[in-house]
């Protein structure tokens, strides 16, 4: 069988019925809420959310972007189709997504997954470079800002940066 692991944001799924996740678990899916919040008013974890939308298949193919797991992303809404960016990454980039997911998985499950099976040898593709950069509110380094500045400084002809949270500092 295929091992399926799902992380979901507890605050982002506040209105999703428990039955939805229970059915996944009953089907053999390993499911965890990311930093479950029982009493939001008294919790220091309420602002430490996980907005990552990552799918990784066998450590070789990854998908990342803005799409959630919901019917509206496939069927659209009454007022029209949902539009979002989600893209496919293969090779070493997919393994970067795998690492990001497995670190988050460890945070909530305490199950450290380091098997080489999750990081297969992948051939190099073309001359493109990809770096998966992650960040969160508890880190002291501004990882995404540093990655953007480094990428801009080292670009030869052009650069594409996509983020829903581009809030540059003043100055």
What do these predicted regions represent?
Residues 2-171:
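Charged, low-complexity intrinsically disordered terminal segments
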